[in-house]
Curated annotation (Swiss-Prot):
GTP binds at residues 12-18, 40-42, 304, 330-332, 412-414. One of its GO terms (molecular function) is GTP binding. GO terms for cellular component: cytoplasm. CDD domains: AdSS (cd03108). The lineage of its organism: Bacteria, Bacillati, Cyanobacteriota, Cyanophyceae, Acaryochloridales. This is Adenylosuccinate synthetase.
Amino acid sequence: MANVVVIGAQWGDEGKGKITDLLSRSADVVVRYQGGVNAGHTVVVNDQTFKLHLIPSGILYPNTDCIIGSGTVIDPKVLIEELDMLDKLGVSTSHLFISESAHVTMPYHRMIDQASEERRGDHKIGTTGRGIGPTYADKSERTGIRILDLMDPEGMKKQLRWTVNYKNVILEKLYNLPHLDPEEVIAEYQVYADRLRPFVADCSLKIYDAYQQHRNILFEGAQGTLLDLDHGTYPYVTSSNPVAGGACVGTGVGPTMIDRVIGVAKAYTTRVGEGPFPTELHDEMGVALCERGAEFGTTTGRRRRCGWFDAVIGRYAVRINGLDCLAVTKLDILDEVDEIKVCVAYEIDGHESKDFPTNARQFSRCNPVYKTLPGWKQSTIHCRTLEDLPPKALDYLKFLASIVEVPIAIVSLGAERDETIIVEDPIHGPKRALLYSNGESQAMSA
């Protein structure tokens, strides 16, 4: 048995959906532990594309239980749309379970999110406008609506009448927006409640039972380390904790139940929305990476900002998450690049540093210190073993493993499941502590 957390090691959009889908073959349970419809993951199977925002990637495996944990925030309308889409595609959803403790995104959350972002003007955070932040804010203020509240028809009516009237004051007085009709909201969410009722469960207990039965559990994060509310590039972050520690809080399991942590990172770096980005490319190369990598958000369709791989961020992700290994995605996007740069340190106010600054103002003054490596100038998409790779592509991967100080277990070379190189078993392979001595890699190092 192995219980594994999969996290994003950059600013999200790293390809966690594909990696989770691959690992789900060995998992008995897949659990989503934070975030909401602000995150999207795409899985491609036999030329069929599945775009999901809330439902875990493991849903494509009929014998794998899928759980939406208590740390998520759920937009019922979007969740039902995903259920309907999967039903039409012939994918069973009978093995999906929704935590009764998860909070619910309401219409006023979306309205406040969009109006608040607009009011920020030049100080926009880059929110998706899907109501995620306000939903988490209500959770912290203890005024939120949970899934279990929707399951109690009479209690829901009473709670929603009070809450909607309270939010109407904010909508009208603060944002000059039209008020919501409490009865219309109640009627809408009663329909959602009836549809979701068969899926609702005490998911913390369900996960613990799976653990007691020695089943393999895979915890699936959304977004990425640098978007973490506590450890990311604040204030340009999400409202939850995508880091590995969030898996425990967002599902109701203890930290001793986690065996391994796998980080996912692109062979380059992308970011959506506002905030500092030291390796961002504003030239033709940045445009080329965006176009070759189809770097447009699953949720918003926004163009992603593109730049070179940042090893400072990589090392930070290793430290914050306790990564055991790394999955590197989209290596094939670099196939036609003449020279590839990797940021190995920052120059900050005249001083060089290899450590990530948590101060956003200081981070905005960071300039990348690059090491330049030769490109391989040939296709990698059909490679299935390390030996199949062009020597310079293998050298690039070895350098990343060495500079980030964690072994690479998976290399992704395309969107399809089989466009992948499995370097070592990411679930049952050696722990990072056994692979490193004095910071030097003994696997895939230069």
